[in-house]
Amino acid sequence: MGKLVYGLGNLEVEIDDRVLAHLQIVVTAKLRRNEGFMLTWTDEPSVGDGRSSIWLHQAIPLHFKYDTNEQPEINRQWLEVLTVSASNAVGMRLVEEPVKS
């Protein structure tokens, strides 16, 4: 499991390396265009089994920490789903990877 470290280390979220790689691509593209957005995910049962959201903006430090050094194969369809969701009013929701078609 990798980690998304938000802010100055105030929040660390464990995320599977494959999910994290896709998230990093979409987040980087959005922030390069100066587009802040909300990111929401479902919490693990160990932290309450609820939902969490953070505001992503280029002024807020963000660190993607991977458990392995292997680059996973990128699913372009998943990138599209994440990108579209990041552009809507409620922001990006981490969703399951769609089956490649």
Model-based region annotation:
Residues 1-16:
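Short, extreme N-terminal segment that most often corresponds to the first beta-strand
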Residues 33-43, 92-101:
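Short glycine-rich, low-complexity/disordered patches
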Residues 68-101:
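Mixed-charge, glycine-accented linear interaction segment located at domain edges/termini
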Residues 25-33:
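Short, intrinsically disordered, mixed-charge
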Residues 15, 22-25:
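N-terminal intrinsically disordered, cationic/polar leader segments
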Residues 21-22, 46, 70:
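Short, surface-exposed beta-strand-loop junctions and turns on beta-sheet-rich folds
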Residues 16, 53-57, 75:
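Helix N-cap / beta->alpha transition motif
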